[in-house]
């Protein structure tokens, strides 16, 4: 599995944790090692409409996708549900939690549980 992380001003330890999280989550979600070797994950950290989103890459096969883009808006993760400002490890845990959630969607795309329909709708 190839994992590329595009980010600025993110600590190296968090990037390493994100890379490890991808391998651990894909294997624990029941994706075989043979299939996992062919996966390409590109993680973009920056401003986005929501905290996280997982998509099939534009040039990937729509019916058997192997290339995915994951968008994480780490700026929205600074404040929790109670309007507390998250600092240090709390913020890192929130980023990893959101990444894990988006990796579940990647698993759904791979297994065909989530697929593209007409006009870009997901079903």
Regions found by a protein language model. Name each.
Residues 89, 93-97, 109-123:
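Post-HEXXH active-site segment of zinc metalloproteases
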Residues 101, 105:
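Histidine-centered divalent metal-coordination motifs
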Residues 50-93, 106-110:
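Active-site scaffold of zinc-dependent metalloenzymes
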Residues 12-72:
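Auxiliary, metal-adjacent structural segments of Zn-dependent hydrolase domains
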């Amino acid at each position: 599995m190839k994992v590329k992380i595009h980010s600025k001003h993110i600590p190296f330890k968090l990037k390493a944790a994100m890379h490890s999280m991808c391998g651990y989550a894909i294997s624990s979600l029941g994706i075989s090692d043979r299939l996992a070797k062919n996966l390409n994950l590109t993680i973009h950290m920056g401003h986005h409409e929501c905290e996280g989103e997982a998509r099939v890459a534009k040039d990937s096969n729509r019916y058997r996708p192997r290339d995915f883009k994951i968008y994480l808006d780490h700026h929205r993760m600074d404040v929790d549900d109670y309007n507390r400002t998250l600092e240090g490890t709390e913020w890192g845990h929130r980023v990893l939690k959101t990444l894990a959630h988006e990796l579940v969607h990647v698993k759904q795309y791979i297994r065909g549980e989530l697929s593209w329909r007409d006009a870009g709708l997901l079903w």
